[in-house]
């Protein structure tokens, strides 16, 4: 099971989301904790200025950006639509 931490940026972005999407975020984070779900969540490496970071999908529009702290620990950096990569 993966331990998940949150940055202040993630918490602020999460607080701005619509309530219905917040529930989806909670469910996706819970799924992310189990590596078996990473393919379904489309966990992927980011490139360019976000090299070293990873992302996973909530749906077709929304993403979570994170970094691995260790093999079993991740820190979530932000959540939002594709503009989080700008």
Where are these regions (language model features)?
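Surface-exposed loop/turn and secondary-structure junction residues enriched for glycine/proline
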Residues: 20, 44-49, 53, 61, ...
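Non-catalytic, surface-exposed connector residues within folded enzymatic/regulatory domains
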Residues: 4, 19, 23-26, 37-40
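Enriched for short, Lys/Arg-rich terminal
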Residues: 4, 8, 12, 16, ...
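Conserved short hydrophobic interaction patches
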Residues: 28-31, 82
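A short, surface-exposed loop/turn module that caps and links secondary-structure elements
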Residues: 31-56
């Amino acid at each position: 099971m993966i331990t998940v931490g949150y940055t202040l940026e993630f918490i602020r972005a999460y607080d701005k989301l619509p309530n219905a999407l917040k529930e989806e975020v909670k469910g996706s984070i819970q799924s992310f904790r189990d590596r078996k779900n990473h393919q379904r969540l489309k966990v992927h490496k980011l490139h360019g200025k976000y090299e070293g970071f990873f992302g996973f999908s909530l749906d077709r529009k929304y993403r979570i950006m994170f970094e691995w702290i260790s093999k079993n620990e991740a820190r979530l950096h932000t959540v939002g639509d594709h503009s989080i990569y700008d």
